[in-house]
Amino acid sequence: MTEKTIVFKVGTSSLTQENGSLDRIKIARITNQLAQLHQKGYQIVLVTSGSIAAGFRRLGFDKRPTKIAEKQASAAVGQGLLIEEYTQNLMKDGIVSAQILLTQDDFADARRYQNASQALQVLLKQRAIPIINENDTIAIEEIKVGDNDTLSAQVASLLKADLLVLLTDVDGLYTANPNSDPTAQHLPQIKEITEDLFAMAAGAGSSNGTGGMTTKLQAAQIATKSGVPVFICSSKEDTALLQAVTQANRGTLFLADDHAMNQRKQWMAFYARTDAAVEVDAGAVDAMLHQGRSLLATGVKALEGDFEVGQVVEVYSQADHRLIGKGRVKLSSKDLQDQLANGRAEGVLIHRNDWVSL
């Protein structure tokens, strides 16, 4: 028996028929595999799209809506239908499921972030399968960008999962879009996610979903930097989920970073709300990135936005305007501005223990 934690993300295209509506056969196939893995001792979390697909026809629309308000309304109807489908299927195998709706705010707020972590840990300990979705009825931006890829990475990182599996309608990452370029080559393993990878990623997904390969790369970047390996594969095979656990099927495996961030630094890097920024000189960049030092107020050359003590701000290199990291500040923007204006900037702005390089 194993107690490994696996987070599966299933996209809309893996759950729907050609007309965009929910496919019960596909859902049954997924839940059957989840049940088999559950019985083997795996701790399973499912991050699922599909609430809009489940609800738009019940609401009277002939095809999947494109307007934000209509999507929100469809999601409000469909979320209950979607979770009911999962719940009934899992109950056939005696498995309890739990619905959790999240938004980015649940990760941006440190207390809610911890609460979400604790609730998920209890559910897994009690052998339930959490079924998680973006709260599409209120999360406007998430509906626009199909951010359940990112959500699944955040959940996997939060739980320190052993593997994140992103199921989609393609069998991994290619050097070009395989649907339009016959020379596209499949990439079975990725050690480091670079800008070149983002450049080659095909950005368009299927019309039923809202996320393409670019969002999956962004998700993989979050997870791998948090110490969680990621496997992207197709959901079309009947046993895709079962095979994905050991990467027996064709896909792309993203290896976990050797120097994974701890949970506190993960929160600063990926989730904390940042409404302000500072620009620092070359000496400060070198001290923070290469010498492990704190950011002194003397290194700050410009600031943007207002911040109070304890808030997380972005830090940019003045030379090339590159984002180099984020950190909690020990001075307010007002105090820092006053110091800079009087030519007497002093003390630590961001301590190295409250800093994460990006």
Curated annotation (Swiss-Prot):
SUPFAM superfamilies the UniProt entry points to: Carbamate kinase-like (SSF53633), PUA domain-like (SSF88697)
Signal peptide interval: none
What GO terms are given for molecular function? ATP binding; glutamate 5-kinase activity; RNA binding
What are the residue boundaries of the PUA domain, all occurrences included?
A: 275-353
List residues binding ATP.
K9, T168, D169, T210, G211, G212, M213, T214, T215, K216
Spell out the GO cellular component terms annotated for this protein, sorted alphabetically and separated by semicolons: cytosol
Q: Which residues form a coiled coil?
A: none
Subcellular location(s) of the protein? Cytoplasm
UniProt keyword list? Amino-acid biosynthesis, ATP-binding, Cytoplasm, Kinase, Nucleotide-binding, Proline biosynthesis, Transferase
Q: Which reaction does it catalyse?
A: L-glutamate + ATP = L-glutamyl 5-phosphate + ADP
In Pfam terms, one family for this protein is: AA_kinase
Biological process, per Gene Ontology: L-proline biosynthetic process
Which EC numbers characterise this protein's activity in its record?
Answer: 2.7.2.11
Q: Which InterPro entries did the record assign?
A: AceGlu_kinase-like_sf, Asp/Glu/Uridylate_kinase, G5K_ProB, Glu/AcGlu_kinase, Glu_5kinase, Glu_5kinase/COase_Synthase, Glutamate_5-kinase_CS, PUA
- Which residues does the annotation say bind substrate? S49, D136, N148
Identify the pathway.
Answer: Amino-acid biosynthesis; L-proline biosynthesis; L-glutamate 5-semialdehyde from L-glutamate: step 1/2
Q: Which CDD domains match?
A: AAK_G5K_ProB, PUA_G5K
Q: Which domain of life is it from?
A: Bacteria
| Similarity comment text for this entry | Belongs to the glutamate 5-kinase family.
**Protein's job:** Catalyzes the transfer of a phosphate group to glutamate to form L-glutamate 5-phosphate.
Protein name stated in the entry: Glutamate 5-kinase
- Organism (species): Streptococcus suis (strain 05ZYH33)
For this protein's source organism, the top of the classification is:
Bacteria, Bacillati, Bacillota, Bacilli, Lactobacillales
